[in-house]
Design a protein with these regions (language model features):
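Conserved radical SAM core fold
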Residues: 162-171
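Alpha-helix-loop-beta-strand connector modules within alpha/beta enzyme cores
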Residues: 174-179
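Proteins enriched for Cys/Gly/acidic motifs involved in redox and nucleic-acid/cofactor modification
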Residues: 1-160
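Glycine-centered secondary-structure boundary/capping sites
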Residues: 82, 171-173
Length: 179
C-alpha cells in the first residue's frame, strides 16, 4: 500500500556508467530514508562489480552478486540487521547459472530472456565483467516459455540476447511479431 513502510527493500542495480552507479547509490539512500528499519538487499550489476562499496552504504544489509540474485529468498531467511552489509558474490569467471525469464511488457508484448552475460569485451561495456561469459538455457525451455506467452495472449515476443533463436520459436502461429 502507498504510504506504508516496507519490511524488505530489494534494489536491482545497473552499472553501465559511473552515472548509473551514482543513480543506484541515490536510489539506495532514498529507500533507506523512506523505509527506516527495513531489511535492504542490493543486487544486480553494480552489486556484482562493486560489492564492497555497496556493502558500506549505510542501511544496506545484504549485497548479492549475479550468481546469487536468483537465490534471493535463501538470503532473506535470516533477516538480521548488521552495522555493515554482508556481500555475497562469485567471481565473474566462475558464474555458470542461467535464470530463465519471460516477462510481460504490456498487454500483448512479452520479453524472453534467452542469454545472460556476453563474450564480447567491448571497451565501453561492463556486461562481461558484471554478468560473466555468455550462457543460456536450453532451446526446449525457451520454446516452452514462448509457447506459454502465446497461450496467454501474447502477440509480440522480443528476445533479449546478442544471438538469435527466432527460428525455434517462430512456429507459434499466434505470435504476430517476433524480434
Amino acid at each position: 500500500m502507498i504510504g506504508e513502510k516496507a519490511d524488505i527493500c530489494v534494489v536491482n542495480t545497473c552499472s553501465v556508467t559511473e552515472m548509473a552507479d551514482k543513480k543506484c547509490r541515490q536510489a539506495i539512500h532514498r529507500l533507506v530514508k523512506q523505509h527506516p528499519g527495513a531489511f535492504v538487499v542490493v543486487t544486480g550489476c553494480y552489486a556484482q562489480l562493486k560489492p564492497g562499496d555497496v556493502a558500506q552504504i549505510k542501511g544496506v544489509d545484504v549485497v548479492l552478486g549475479a550468481e546469487q540474485k536468483s537465490d534471493l529468498l535463501r538470503y532473506l531467511g535470516n533477516l538480521q540487521k548488521h552495522e555493515e552489509g554482508e556481500a555475497f558474490t562469485t567471481a565473474t569467471k566462475d558464474i555458470r547459472s542461467f535464470s530463465p525469464s519471460c516477462s510481460r511488457g504490456d498487454r500483448t508484448r512479452f520479453f524472453l530472456k534467452v542469454q545472460d552475460g556476453c563474450d564480447y569485451f567491448c571497451s565501453y561495456c561492463t556486461i562481461p565483467f558484471a554478468r560473466g561469459r555468455s550462457r543460456n538455457g536450453t532451446i526446449a525451455s525457451m520454446v516452452e516459455q514462448a509457447g506459454q506467452a502465446a497461450a496467454e495472449g501474447g502477440k509480440e515476443l522480443r528476445e533479449r540476447d546478442t544471438n538469435s533463436i527466432i527460428s525455434s520459436v517462430s512456429r507459434f502461429g499466434s505470435m504476430e511479431d517476433i524480434r
